[in-house]
Amino acid sequence: MSTENRVIDLVVDENVPYGLLMQFMDVDDSVYPSTSKPVDLTDFSLRGSIKSSLEDGAETVASFTTAIVDAAQGVASISLPVSAVTTIASKASKERDRYNPRQRLAGYYDVIITRTAVGSAASSFRIMEGKVYISDGVTQ
């Protein structure tokens, strides 16, 4: 399984839950126009977490709640409840982003997808990775 555009920085809004819905597609570029069909996510699972740095032993700031929403259509989700967003905001850098002063670096994340194959070893792939920013809110 290969992925494109897997480095995606996430911006998590303060004071509200975070969620991301993803659809996995198998794209055939060998024909014109290209065709695509959903990847069947039956027997797949996701896991992901946010750490304060990329160093070994870095603190895990939060773990994503993950779900396969519609296996046949290749739809999955990652989310964070408000309590996790609050923790992320409290541990984010106090230094504001140079280009968007509302944002502060909160850490680094990745999401792993695992296929549990019957009778053989499970295979796992990192499907997403990047930085996590907290976007400071003003409304409580």
Swiss-Prot record:
UniProt keywords, alphabetically: Late protein, Viral tail fiber protein, Viral tail protein, Virion
The UniProt record lists the keyword Transmembrane helix: no
Q: In terms of domain of life, where is this protein from?
A: Viruses
Choose one Gene Ontology CC annotation of this protein and give it.
virus tail, fiber
Q: Which InterPro entries match?
A: LtfC/p132/Gp6_b-sand
Q: Where in the cell is it found?
A: Virion
Subunit field text: Homododecamer. Interacts with baseplate tube protein p140.
Which purpose does this protein serve, as stated in its record?
Forms the collar, into which the side tail fiber protein pb1 is anchored.
UniProt name for this protein = Collar protein p132
Q: What is the lineage of its organism?
A: Viruses, Duplodnaviria, Heunggongvirae, Uroviricota, Caudoviricetes
